[in-house]
């Protein structure tokens, strides 16, 4: 028998056949200490769970596709959670967005297999880094671009970029067992 902590666990884990969902979100991470819940900083996951608690009446255990560091943004981030209740999936996105801060948005939701896990189902990640080649910061992109003041040697950068083209095995950079 499982013990429930008030305001923490979702009762669907104990009493009902659970339904697993894949929720796609986007967020600007400037105001957050990353995705994963931490005791000393606001996090994206905690904000999502707060919204879920208000909409679903329980706080599901959320599994993100990846961890992100403080200040990192995500245009399309997958997370999975289980829930059985009265709120239909087609109403969840709009309802979550009504309770999420404006820098986090729910995009779409799909029912998935019960054993689906967002982290283990992720097969690829795409990272984008933006460089602003200017003497002065742009007030609209200062927190999403790295400003480089001196003129860049574009030809040298293109030559260096050629070395990245193709498929590469970065398994040696992964944590053991991941």
Segments from the language model and where they lie:
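Structured-RNA-binding interfaces characteristic of tRNA pseudouridine synthases
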Residues: 13-178
């Amino acid at each position: 028998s499982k013990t429930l902590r008030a305001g923490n666990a979702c009762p669907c884990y104990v009493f009902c056949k659970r339904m697993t969902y894949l929720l796609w979100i986007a967020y600007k991470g400037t105001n957050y200490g990353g995705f994963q819940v931490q005791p000393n900083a606001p996090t994206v996951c905690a904000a999502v769970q707060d919204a879920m608690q208000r909409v679903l009446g329980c706080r599901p255990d959320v599994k993100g596709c990846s961890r992100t560091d403080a200040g990192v943004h995500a245009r399309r981030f997958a997370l999975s959670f289980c829930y059985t209740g009265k709120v239909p999936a087609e109403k969840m996105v709009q309802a979550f967005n009504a309770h999420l801060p404006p820098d986090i948005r729910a995009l779409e939701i799909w029912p998935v297999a019960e054993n689906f896990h967002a982290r283990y189902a992720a097969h690829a990640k795409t990272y984008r880094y933006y460089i602003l080649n200017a003497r002065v910061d742009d007030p609209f992109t200062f927190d999403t671009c790295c400003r480089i003041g001196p003129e860049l040697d574009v030809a040298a950068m293109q030559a260096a970029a050629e070395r990245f083209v193709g498929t590469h095995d970065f398994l040696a950079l992964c944590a053991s067992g991941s």
